[in-house]
């Protein structure tokens, strides 16, 4: 992914610089997350934006039609710029890189917690505190996923650290120790 980062990083840094100058960072981070969610939920949109067949003007019309009421003017101008420079096809990578740089600059760790069932707010709070202690960071962004195959418990990952407190893992370990 280093080659893609060499393309996405300048755009992501430019967007971050614009929002920092306009003091819109938190608002922009929220909009970028919503935009990523919208694109990830719509494979047709992602195909259209990355299609080499569609002309730049057609892509800009799609952007204006879909995003004009959903994003602020700075982000809209950024999307149009990407279309003009024929980089709109890597929009998700640019936005993900923007969030990575934002987290790095703000000392925010990204943690993914996968559980067998939906976690309550109390459970999320407890897990967040444990992960903050382990990761040695002040702030944490928690992404939750559900995987019923875990049976119970959770698996949390922050960077290269993984905490496997799942029932499936414990059963697997028990099975391995019994087979010896």
Curated annotation (Swiss-Prot):
This is ATP synthase subunit delta. Transmembrane segments: none annotated. Keywords: ATP synthesis, CF(1), Hydrogen ion transport, Ion transport, Membrane, Thylakoid, Transport. It is a peripheral membrane protein. It comes from the Bacteria. Belongs to the ATPase delta chain family. Signal peptide: none annotated. Pfam families: OSCP.
